[in-house]
Design a protein with these regions (language model features):
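Conserved alpha-helix/loop element of class I SAM-dependent methyltransferases that forms part
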Residues: 24-43, 58
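Class I SAM-dependent methyltransferase SAM/SAH-binding core
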Residues: 46-102
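A short acidic, Gly/Pro-enriched loop at the edge of an enzyme's catalytic core
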Residues: 101-112
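A short SAM/SAH-binding and catalytic strip from SAM-dependent methyltransferases
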Residues: 112-124
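A short glycine-rich, Lys/Arg-flanked "PGG" loop and its adjoining helix->strand segment in the class I
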Residues: 126-138
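Conserved beta-strand signature within the Rossmann-like core of class I S-adenosyl-L-methionine
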Residues: 139-146
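Short alpha-helix
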Residues: 162-177
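Core SAM-dependent methyltransferase catalytic element
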Residues: 180, 186-202
Length: 202
């Protein structure tokens, strides 16, 4: 396995190093994006591709009486996320091994679903977005957060199995999954957060 595969599926010692690095390097974009959601005291959140677990930890602080769950394809990531959030495991925090296209949670149980720096590596993006739509409650929010949105970025050739999506592409996938009120938010550094709502069917 090429070492860049650890971007999508951290394993072994190198994977542990990657997870520690991600917790640090993803902090600016994570804090910026989390401010875009109106957190309640009892918000139920799911972070897909939870990596090192720092965003779950932040969500638990933002919603002191809510829950924060995580899913990751990497067993190393699941272990790290559990370690970082061990204080609330089994009570307010639930972390499972799984993928975005087959989310191991029941339908309509989350107020917000986030995906930080991870959709580049999802095999079937449409199926994954359909799954996110399924687990969201009515009026729930999906937030896809990316630093990369230019298909010509050199990262596209440097990292194994990466696919970089434009805001327009992500918006279309979301629309096809049934999402509405799709908004593309960008900051001065070019970081992107594509937000969408699951509206109740009347």
């Amino acid at each position: 396995m090429g070492w860049t595969r650890n971007f999508s599926n951290p394993k072994g010692f190198i994977g542990k190093v990657f997870l520690a690095s991600m917790n640090a390097t993803h902090t600016p974009i994570s804090k910026w994006a989390l401010k875009k959601y109106d957190w309640k005291t009892d918000t139920a959140a799911l972070d897909i591709g939870c990596g090192g677990g720092m965003n779950i930890k932040r969500m638990l602080k933002l919603s002191p009486h809510g829950i924060a769950a995580g899913v990751d394809v990497s067993e190393e990531s699941v272990k790290k996320s559990m370690q970082v959030n061990r204080k609330h495991l089994g009570t307010r925090c639930f972390i499972k091994h799984g993928s975005a296209d087959n989310i191991p949670f029941e339908s309509e149980c989350f107020d917000v679903v986030t995906a930080f720096e991870t959709i580049y590596f999802w095999g079937d993006l449409q199926k994954s977005f359909n799954e996110i739509f399924r687990v969201l409650k009515n009026d729930g929010t999906f937030m896809a957060v990316c630093e990369l949105s230019d298909s010509k970025s050199p990262w596209g050739k440097m990292v194994e199995n990466i696919r970089i999506y434009t805001p327009e592409q992500l918006s279309q996938y979301m629309s096809d999954a049934g999402f509405t009120d799709i908004k593309v938010l960008k900051n001065k550094s070019g970081r992107m957060c594509v937000c969408a709502k699951k509206k109740a069917v009347i």
